[in-house]
Design a protein with these regions (language model features):
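Domain-level signature for soluble enzymes in the chorismate/prephenate branch of the shikimate pathway
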Residues: 1-278
Length: 278
């Protein structure tokens, strides 16, 4: 858990989201947290100084990367200062007593995708409606007859719903990674056990350029744990590449690998070198 004891933390609300669970996992149950309607508003709060930190989902191990969050890492001039992984257990919450009376299912698009198989088997005719968060879906289900939301079980108590079905996500071990964002680099753990370093870069659109970028990591024994690409939006089919590697930028091997890689890029930015919260 973080050693930080002051400052506001912004997260994707309303209350009862997995984002709020991530906040509590990092900063504790007593942390002062504010719910925001979307990722942009979370990072707006950090940039404006309303919040010291912002917590956003970046990747789910079942459904992949949250692409909007990835784009925001490039668009905003903020730093990643921490990461936490939260187990995701989705539940179907409703006012209805019978599953067949549910005609609409509200949830975040990621949750709908993560429960696609279960919904197709058990509720093939129910309309699936994407909303800004799972908690918003639960909130809607609490005021609409014939509606259900997919959310964490804590949302059932918050919104006065019953769990018509529990653990409806496709596959076991479903987890989501969340990033902690801040205006400036800072250490949020006193005794971190593991570090990651994240960068974004672009390379010339010529044969072998991306391969050349990878060689310094192999030469310096640096383990890459993730690579993603996103369109550069310049009209020329160019891409920005996001890479996570194990280790701190202060580690000699990582530092030397990144220096060699930066020299081969057209655009380069260190997004953060940060602790991974247990």
């Amino acid at each position: 858990m973080s050693s930080v004891t002051d400052g506001v933390v912004a997260f994707l609300g309303p209350a009862g989201t997995f984002s709020e669970q991530a906040v509590r996992a990092v900063f504790g149950r007593e942390a002062k947290a504010i719910a925001e309607p979307d990722f942009d508003a979370v990072l707006d709060a950090v940039e404006s100084g309303e919040a010291r930190f912002g917590v956003i989902a970046i990747e789910n191990n079942t459904n992949g990367t949250v692409t909007h969050a990835l784009d925001l890492l490039l668009e905003r001039r903020l730093c990643i200062v921490g990461e936490v992984s939260v187990p995701v257990v989705h539940n179907l919450l409703t006012l209805e007593k019978r599953l067949e009376d549910v005609r609409r299912v509200y949830a975040h698009a990621q949750a709908l995708a993560q429960c696609r198989g279960w919904l197709s088997r058990h509720m093939p005719d129910a309309e699936r409606i994407a909303v800004s968060s799972n908690a918003e879906g639960a909130s809607r289900a609490s005021i609409e007859r014939g509606a259900a939301g997919i959310a964490a079980i804590v949302a059932a108590d918050i919104y006065g719903l019953r769990a018509a079905a529990k653990s409806i996500q496709d596959g076991e071990g479903n987890r989501t990674r969340f990033l902690v964002m801040a205006r400036e680099p800072e250490m949020i753990l006193e005794t971190p056990k593991a570090f990651k370093t994240s960068i974004v870069f672009s390379v010339p659109n010529v044969p072998g350029s991306l391969y050349d970028m990878m060689t310094p990591m192999a030469e310096n024994g640096v383990q890459m744990v993730r690579i993603e690409s996103r369109p550069a939006r310049n009209g020329f089919w160019d891409y920005n590449f996001f890479i996570d590697v194990e280790g701190s930028v202060e580690t000699p091997g990582v530092r030397e690998a990144l220096a060699a890689m930066e020299a081969r890029t057209e655009h380069w930015r260190l997004l953060g070198s940060y602790p991974v919260v247990d």
